[in-house]
């Protein structure tokens, strides 16, 4: 197995589920023995914390970036009481790495030291069809290229520094010029679309399972864009259900908070 692939597998939902069921993981053990070669008599979460420290110092992969964003932005600047996070959400032909929703929706596109920038323009354009704030999170390696493309635009730029802090290079600005009703409709789940329509007291013609998508969209697209976008953000915020596990989640190790948040399994470490 490729050594990098080994450590990438450690920080995954599949491994988290294994730990929840068995309280151990052969993948974690193998990676720990390879990278850390430390004491054997520690539990699986302690091994994951040691492996995360390796990521911090030697291999800042996408998981490290995502977990840093969750800890420093969702938990550091905001609150799980008022803010909802989404991850790996398809928008057009792109996948949004991380989205924060409070009074507004902000898409965070991650470009690690390991990534290329080839698709970045297309990704940003896709995101602006659904959300009006977009931020690129990158590093010193890519900063000059990112700045050359997006300086003095509406795109925000954050840098994950060598000290593993987030430094704001350019503040994001609201951009409504590319918002697209069809893209927003497709981003929402079926019941969310229906609630948005109901909130606006729109008359809905009779439909069946075969005509539902088109009939509801014909109604949906008549809602004024500003109202529509605000309603969409409100609906998306409801997807967060970590509040019932708040105390347990906040007490969990910082190294695995991203996995726990999106797995909705905050008692894995117990």
Predicted regions and their residues:
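A conserved mid-domain beta-alpha-beta active-site/ligand-binding segment of alpha/beta enzyme cores
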Residues: 165-237
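C-terminal, charge/polar-rich interaction regions
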Residues: 222-270
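Nuclease catalytic cores
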Residues: 21, 58, 62, 221-225, ...
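Short acidic-glycine loop/turn motifs at beta-strand connectors
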Residues: 102-104, 161-164, 172
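Catalytic cores of nucleic-acid endonucleases
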Residues: 114-161
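Interdomain/boundary linker segments immediately adjacent to catalytic/signaling cores
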Residues: 1-60
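Conserved catalytic cores of phosphodiester-cleaving nucleases, focusing on short active-site segments
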Residues: 98-100, 104-114
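Active-site metal-binding core of divalent-cation-utilizing nuclease and nuclease-like domains
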Residues: 57, 63-103, 150
């Amino acid at each position: 197995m490729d050594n990098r692939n080994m450590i990438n597998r450690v920080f995954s939902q599949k491994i988290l589920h294994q730990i929840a069921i068995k309280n151990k993981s052969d993948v974690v053990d193998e990676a720990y023995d390879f990278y850390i070669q430390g004491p054997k008599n520690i539990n699986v979460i302690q091994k994951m914390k040691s492996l995360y420290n390796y990521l911090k110092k030697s291999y800042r992969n996408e998981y490290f970036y995502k977990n840093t964003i969750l800890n420093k932005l969702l938990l550091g600047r905001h609150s799980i009481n008022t803010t909802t996070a989404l991850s790996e959400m398809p928008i057009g032909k792109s996948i949004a790495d991380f989205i924060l929703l409070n009074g507004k929706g902000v898409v965070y596109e991650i470009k690690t030291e390991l990534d290329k920038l080839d698709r970045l323009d297309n990704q940003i354009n896709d995101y602006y069809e659904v959300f009006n704030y977009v931020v690129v999170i990158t590093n010193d390696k890519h900063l000059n290229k990112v700045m050359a493309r997006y300086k003095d635009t509406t795109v925000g730029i954050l840098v994950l520094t060598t000290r593993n802090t987030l430094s704001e290079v350019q503040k994001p600005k609201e951009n409504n010029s590319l918002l697209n009703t069809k893209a927003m409709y497709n981003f929402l789940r079926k019941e969310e679309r229906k609630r948005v329509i109901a909130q606006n007291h729109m008359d809905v013609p009779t439909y069946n399972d075969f005509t539902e998508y088109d009939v509801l969209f014909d109604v949906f697209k008549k809602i004024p864009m500003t109202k529509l976008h605000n309603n969409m953000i409100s609906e998306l915020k409801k997807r967060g259900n970590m509040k019932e596990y708040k105390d347990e989640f906040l007490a969990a190790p910082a190294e695995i908070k991203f996995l726990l948040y999106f797995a909705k399994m905050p008692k894995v470490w117990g």
